[in-house]
């Protein structure tokens, strides 16, 4: 009788590459990077569609007769805007005659501002000030700053006030023979006797704790006063020095100008200029004292609830050709920590007219229709990869990818996978030994890395017959991994603390530090991914070897008494008893199908960060899926012996 020996043999040729892992190695026909680099999309987006609000003008106003051709946003996004054609936050604050006066108010964790162009040099607003750009700059900056600390904000368009009896509402020729609604101008008649200058003005206004349904913890108030070049300009009638001062309830000066103690400008002009400072005041009763003749009375404010920190995006607001714009919005946002600025690269070219419906702006604002994982000055990202080719400029919020070179991202095996015995050679070298246990990996692997370091490795369990190490020994190995990575992070933190010593209040130094921190985090994450890659390879290798043993067990069961297993994966069979069809039944039942495989691995990576920290990523958590489907094809080598 002729007996033959039949063995399972893993088939590997030159097309396979070897991948070393902790606990086992793999041959694979292909390989791929654990993550691909993502590229941010230019423009604005939001982290959560349910928690944002916008403030705009005709370019976001659905009631505009030319909508949607006049709009720079989609109809869906326009629903989010509080807008009115011709309006702006500053116009509603000051209320110059003949301009749109809109009640801006709303709530949202993320506030987007696309307005401001309606108060620009083209508007030609005078009222004792031919150029309002610096006041607009300070106003917009204050709005962005307070909006970033509040959930809700609202214009308060009527403050309670008490006006002295001797004054009446005044007008000005250079203000369309009217005057601003805020501050209101009150005058005191001193004629016919010019030497009688009238009385000092004393008025009161109250900043409310609530306006309608809006809570007010802090108000933005315009403290306006006249600036005279010399005492003689104001003192033509012998009325002393000019002053206009605001006091709080305790008598403390909070704003204004007092030429009784402060010098005049010394210039040669004979017409005063109005200056307005932006004050942040708590609710309460305030008094205004002014010299005779003129009283500028605060009658409006913007109120903020100051309940939570939030995000602010400011969109450049400029005219098309033929109209003069300013760049106060840009400068205000750039000088406000945490404000993200959206800027055009080309002139504004409208579709509905020269000033409405710009295609570039539509593209920049199209991201407002979506939810992003990360928003930054460099753009927005909604892909799940933790890496991007270029450093994302701050401010940035959400789960922002870190800068990395493509070649530094570890590769994992893919395609046809063949397990081999043994472990990574580096594990056997004492100097580079990372783990205390060689047989480390078992089952489904999920890694959670938190801000303080490794939070824990959570293990799924395989069926008892699957083999492998005990849960207790694996957990000890994972604890060692956690300690080693924690040491890596501690070293990084020590380096960061040293860098902190050279930081004062220099903005560029802070940005440089932020970049160094992100680079350190990127390197640390890449190092951790390298370890995870090795764990994955070992885990798959062990799982596939178990699959081969399961196949061998199935063959033994099918053979019964017809074949004798002489060594793992090898059988002796008598071909006089079991002919070719019999052998095919035993050994080739799975000839064209894959060997049973381990469940797909669902290892995930997700960069967690404080959503309101301008420096971005504060912690790392492994949460973006990498699914690896393993496939093994068995070959049968037949050795004939007499």
Swiss-Prot record:
It comes from the Viruses. Residues 1 form the signal peptide. Binds to the N-acetyl-9-O-acetylneuraminic acid residues on the cell surface, bringing about the attachment of the virus particle to the cell. Plays a major role in the determination of host range restriction and virulence. Class I viral fusion protein. Responsible for penetration of the virus into the cell cytoplasm by mediating the fusion of the membrane of the endocytosed virus particle with the endosomal membrane. Low pH in endosomes induce an irreversible conformational change in HEF2, releasing the fusion hydrophobic peptide. Several trimers are required to form a competent fusion pore. InterPro entries: Capsid_hemagglutn (IPR008980), Hemagglutn-estrase_core (IPR007142), Hemagglutn-estrase_hemagglutn (IPR003860), Hemagglutn_stalk_influenz-C (IPR014831). Disulfide bonds join 7-570, 107-152, 127-175, 197-239, 216-303, 224-276, 333-339. The chain crosses the membrane at residues 618-638. This is Hemagglutinin-esterase-fusion glycoprotein. Glycans are attached at residues 13, 48, 131, 382. Its EC number is 3.1.1.53. Homotrimer of disulfide-linked HEF1-HEF2. Residues 353-638 are annotated as: Fusion domain-2. GO terms for cellular component: host cell plasma membrane; membrane; viral envelope; virion membrane. Residues 28-138 are annotated as: Esterase domain-1. In natural infection, inactive HEF is matured into HEF1 and HEF2 outside the cell by one or more trypsin-like, arginine-specific endoprotease. GO terms for biological process: fusion of virus membrane with host endosome membrane; fusion of virus membrane with host plasma membrane; symbiont entry into host cell; virion attachment to host cell. Residues 298-352 are annotated as: Esterase domain-2. The active site is at residues 58, 353, 356. It is a single-pass type I membrane protein. It is found in: Virion membrane; Host cell membrane. It comes from Influenza C virus (strain C/England/892/1983). It catalyses: N-acetyl-9-O-acetylneuraminate + H2O = N-acetylneuraminate + acetate + H(+); N-acetyl-4-O-acetylneuraminate + H2O = N-acetylneuraminate + acetate + H(+). Belongs to the influenza type C/coronaviruses hemagglutinin-esterase family. The lineage of its organism: Viruses, Riboviria, Orthornavirae, Negarnaviricota, Polyploviricotina. The keyword Lipoprotein does not apply. Gene3D superfamilies: 2.20.70.20, 3.90.20.10. Pfam families: Hema_esterase, Hema_HEFG, Hema_stalk. It is an enzyme of class 3 (hydrolase). Keywords: Disulfide bond, Fusion of virus membrane with host endosomal membrane, Fusion of virus membrane with host membrane, Glycoprotein, Hemagglutinin, Host cell membrane, Host membrane, Host-virus interaction, Hydrolase, Membrane, Signal, Transmembrane, Transmembrane helix, Viral attachment to host cell, Viral envelope protein, Viral penetration into host cytoplasm, Virion, Virus entry into host cell.
């Amino acid at each position: 009788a002729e007996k033959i020996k039949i063995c399972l043999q893993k088939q590997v040729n030159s097309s396979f590459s070897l991948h070393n892992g902790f606990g086992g190695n793999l041959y694979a026909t292909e390989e791929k990077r654990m993550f691909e680099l993502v590229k941010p999309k230019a423009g604005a987006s939001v982290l959560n569609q349910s928690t944002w609000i916008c403030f705009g003008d005709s370019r976001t106003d659905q009631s505009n007769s030319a909508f949607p051709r006049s709009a720079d946003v989609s109809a869906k996004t326009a629903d989010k805007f509080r807008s009115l054609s011709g309006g702006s936050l500053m116009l509603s604050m000051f209320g110059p005659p003949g301009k749109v006066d809109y009640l801006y108010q709303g709530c949202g964790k993320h506030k987007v501002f696309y307005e401001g162009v309606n108060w620009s040099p083209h508007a030609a607003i005078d009222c004792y000030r031919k150029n309002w750009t610096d006041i607009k700059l300070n106003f917009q900056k204050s709005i962005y700053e307070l909006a970033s600390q509040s959930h809700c904000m609202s214009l308060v368009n009527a403050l309670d006030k008490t006006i002295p009896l001797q004054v009446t509402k005044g007008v000005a020729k250079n203000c369309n023979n009217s005057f601003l609604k805020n501050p209101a101008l009150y005058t005191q008649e001193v004629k016919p006797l010019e030497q009688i200058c009238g009385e000092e003005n004393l008025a009161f206004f109250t900043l409310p704790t609530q306006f309608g349904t809006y809570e007010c913890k802090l108000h933005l108030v315009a403290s306006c006063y006249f600036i005279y070049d010399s005492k003689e300009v104001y003192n033509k009638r012998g009325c002393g020095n000019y002053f206009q001062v605001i006091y709080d309830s305790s008598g403390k000066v909070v704003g204004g100008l007092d030429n009784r103690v402060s010098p005049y400008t010394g210039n040669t002009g004979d017409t005063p200029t109005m200056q307005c400072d932006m004050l942040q005041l708590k609710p309460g009763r305030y008094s205004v004292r002014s010299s005779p003749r003129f009283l500028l009375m605060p009658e409006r404010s913007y109120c903020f609830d100051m309940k939570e920190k939030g995000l602010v995006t400011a969109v450049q607001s400029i005219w098309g050709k033929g109209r003069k714009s300013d760049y106060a919005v840009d400068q205000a946002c750039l000088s406000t920590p945490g404000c993200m600025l959206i800027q055009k690269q080309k002139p504004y070219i409208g579709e509905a007219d020269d000033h409405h419906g710009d295609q570039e702006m539509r593209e920049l604002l199209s991201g407002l229709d979506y939810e992003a994982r990360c928003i930054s000055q460099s753009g927005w990202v909604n892909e799940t990869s933790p890496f991007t080719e270029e450093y994302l400029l701050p401010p940035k919020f959400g789960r922002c990818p870190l800068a990395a070179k493509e070649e530094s991202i570890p590769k994992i095996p893919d395609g046809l996978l063949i397990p081999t015995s043994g472990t990574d050679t580096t594990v056997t070298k004492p100097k580079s030994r990372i783990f205390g246990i060689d047989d480390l990996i078992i089952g489904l692997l999920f890694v959670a890395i938190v801000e303080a370091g490794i939070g824990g490795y959570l293990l799924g369990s395989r069926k008892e017959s699957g083999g492998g190490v005990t849960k207790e020994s694996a957990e000890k190995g994972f604890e060692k991994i956690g300690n080693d990575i924690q040491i890596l992070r501690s070293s990084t933190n020590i380096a960061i603390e040293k860098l902190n010593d050279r930081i004062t209040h220099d903005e560029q130094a802070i940005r440089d530090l932020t970049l160094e921190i992100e680079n350190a985090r990127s390197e640390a994450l890449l190092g951790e991914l390298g370890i995870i890659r090795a764990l994955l390879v070992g885990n798959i290798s062990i799982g596939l070897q178990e699959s081969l043993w399961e196949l061998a067990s199935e063959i033994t069961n099918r053979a019964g008494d017809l074949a004798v297993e002489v060594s793992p994966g090898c059988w002796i069979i008598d071909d006089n008893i079991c002919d070719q069809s019999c052998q095919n039944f035993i050994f080739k039942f799975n000839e064209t199908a894959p060997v049973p495989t381990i469940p797909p691995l669902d290892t995930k990576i997700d960069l967690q960060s404080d959503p309101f920290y301008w420096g971005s990523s504060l912690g790392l958590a492994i949460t973006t899926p990498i699914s690896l489907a393993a496939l093994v094809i068995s070959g049968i080598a037949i050795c004939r012996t007499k």
